[in-house]
């Protein structure tokens, strides 16, 4: 990204990159964002909310949320899944989920996944894929060449490039090498 959006403090802010290429500094913008997108931002609470999934959207529009060093942000996806993003993290996700619920993470985030038996939620972190139905867990890709997944509630399946799978129980940690 050659373009950098700077917030009111003069430092890079939390940036929402829309599917049409627009970049929005969330620290400087409150209320609804973008035409045709049901997204509401609350910078004072560091929260971004997407409207409930209506299941009608067929074209997958991908957005990206970048959280810089020294910041954190809370995101509610269109299916109701809640994501708490840590500093120096990036999440790529669809505006509305289709037949699958898949996101890509760089950095660290805590997920509270809305249960949906027919559409598993998958977090891709490099070569690692964490697959869930409805649970709470943390994924951290901040360590070089390692992805850590910690399960809080429910169960998750961690795959390393499709080669090896492990199912975690609450309180367990999986550390995968080779991202």
Go through each PLM region and give its residues:
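Short acidic/polar, Gly/Pro-enriched loop/turn segments located at secondary-structure boundaries
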Residues: 1-146, 159-178
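Propeptide (latency) domains of metzincin metalloproteases
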Residues: 150-151
